[in-house]
Swiss-Prot record:
Family: Belongs to the G-protein coupled receptor 1 family.
Native source organism of the sequence: Homo sapiens
Keyword Disulfide bond in annotation: yes
GO biological process, one term: signal transduction
Residues bearing attached sugar chains per UniProt: N5, N89
Cytoplasmic domain ranges by topology: 47-54, 121-139, 218-237, 293-324
Protein name: Olfactory receptor 7G2
Length: 324
């Protein structure tokens, strides 16, 4: 059937990962488990930082924000997929798709900027340890978060609102489990030159600048570590930034993997699987990277988890008293 321009559309179809109905319960259980692990892991990190005054430092301030972002980014995509699987309905409304695109761009862009701020924090901690508390003061930390928020809002609105000017064809199937900007643009019947220019411009500015900041920070860190006279000092410096560097490599490596997959393969299923590595896996793994490699975080988590039974008991007792 010939594709026709359709300026007003009501919904898109999210094809997801697997079409076999018999495998849908398995897929539902898998993604529900991954989502719960992501929420629980990042929530524990967030609550541990809030509850322990010893962790009220710039590094853990940024880490708690990263955990909150991971929760938000996962919640933007996975629950809709779970609802679609459970209801056996793969559709998403036009407004819902546009909203999902906007939030994915916002949270992913904000995480990108936050990783750059964390890299600068590690640079100051290793290269200027005596001036660390002076440089990384609460005002600067707040300004870095505010700048990241403003940058991410501009990026998300610029890229998502341009979809409003597009007309779409009759083929409205997205070969992913969530609405992704590049996939939606491929469905349009309109001229996408301006859209593609804006995408590359935004990638260079809003993506390239934070990445350049990360590379510059770690270049300075490497130079500083190599000049350290003692092996213990070098080991401490490497362990200080090891967790953050692992998350950076995972974040950008997953994004690069999705891009390479979309270029070298014509299979929508392979692209969909690669998108999982970018939109689900890093958010699930990040809490384990920081909790397993950080002694302070491990100690705080043990204390916090040990207090959970008593907190639950207090909550139950309070509930009974309230009912009385």
């Amino acid at each position: 059937m010939e594709a026709r321009n359709q300026t007003a559309i009501s919904k898109f179809l999210l094809l997801g990962l697997i079409e076999d109905p018999e495998l849908q319960p398995v897929l539902f259980s898998l993604f529900l488990s991954m989502y719960l692990v992501t929420i629980l892991g990042n929530l524990l990190i967030l609550l541990a930082v809030i509850s322990d005054s010893h962790l009220h430092t710039p590094m853990y301030f940024f880490l708690s924000n990263l955990s909150f972002l991971d929760i938000c980014l996962s919640t933007t995509t996975i629950p809709k997929m779970l609802v679609n699987i459970q209801a056996q309905n793969r559709s998403i409304t036009y407004s819902g798709c546009l909203t999902q695109i906007c939030f994915v761009l916002f949270f992913a862009g904000l995480e990108n900027c936050l990783l750059a701020a964390m890299a600068y924090d590690r640079y100051v901690a290793i290269c200027h340890p005596l001036r660390y508390t002076v440089i990384m003061n609460p005002r600067l930390c707040g300004l870095l978060i505010l700048l990241s928020l403003l940058t991410s809002v501009v990026n998300a609105l610029l890229l998502s609102l341009m979809v409003l000017r597009l007309s779409f064809c009759t083929d409205l199937e997205i070969p992913l489990f969530f609405c992704e900007l590049a996939q939606v643009i491929q469905l349009t019947c309109s001229d996408t030159l301006i859209n593609n220019i804006l995408i590359y411009f935004a990638a260079c500015i809003f993506g390239g600048v934070p990445l350049s900041g990360i590379i510059l920070s770690y270049t300075q860190i490497t130079s500083c570590v190599l000049r350290m006279p003692s092996a213990s000092g070098k080991h401490k410096a490497v362990s200080t930034c090891g967790s953050h560097l692992s998350i950076v490599l995972l974040f950008y490596g997953a994004g690069l993997g999705v891009y390479i997959s979309s270029v070298v393969t014509d299979s929508p299923r392979k692209t969909a699987v690669a998108s999982v590595m970018y939109s689900v896996f890093p958010q699930m793994v990040n809490p384990f990277i920081y909790s397993l490699r950080n002694k302070d975080m491990k100690g705080t988590l043990r204390k916090f988890i040990g207090r959970i039974p008593s907190l639950l008991w207090c909550a139950i007792c309070f509930g009974f008293r309230f009912l009385e």
